[in-house]
């Protein structure tokens, strides 16, 4: 079991190989992907503390994804049912694309542009992640490649029409 250190971000509590402790963790990737993943890791480590990058990211989050922060609503019935604990929910359905996944897609597209890449690549199960990456990729002028599991395709083939439309 991993012991967390107070006052230190979880993302910084791993060894040089990416292990967070226990029998799981780290990364196990094919040899051909080690360099691209290493390059991405170096860039990410630099940009996650870069005030200009974070300011740009926050601009997209608050001005492009949604005009200002997405709102919260109080869940009155659940609050009453639980006996007084106030329960609130964030209404991310008002964000561009209608899901929270747009935030990760925007950040991935920004990283992709910074690396000089032309393609944004992702996977999707139910289609939301692919949809959000398609929206972000279009905004940043990137081509998008979305992978979906073989067994998911027959049930969600209508999603491909949406990807092509975006």
What residue spans do the PLM features occupy?
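PLP-dependent amino-acid enzyme catalytic core
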Residues: 1-166
């Amino acid at each position: 079991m991993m012991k967390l250190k107070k006052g230190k971000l979880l993302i910084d509590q791993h060894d040089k190989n990416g292990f967070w402790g226990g029998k799981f963790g780290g990364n196990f990737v094919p040899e051909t992907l080690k360099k691209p993943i290493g390059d991405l890791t170096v860039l990410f480590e630099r940009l996650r503390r870069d005030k200009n990058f974070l300011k740009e990211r926050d601009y997209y989050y608050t001005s492009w994804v949604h005009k200002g922060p997405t709102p919260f609503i109080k869940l009155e019935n659940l609050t009453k049912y639980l006996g007084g604990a106030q329960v609130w929910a964030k209404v991310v359905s008002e964000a561009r694309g209608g899901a929270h996944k747009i935030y990760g897609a925007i950040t991935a597209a920004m990283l992709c542009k910074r690396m000089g890449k032309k393609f944004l690549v992702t996977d999707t199960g139910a289609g939301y992640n692919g949809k959000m990456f398609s929206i972000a990729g279009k905004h940043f002028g990137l081509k998008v490649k979305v992978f979906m599991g073989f067994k998911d395709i027959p049930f969600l083939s209508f999603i491909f029409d949406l990807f092509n439309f975006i």
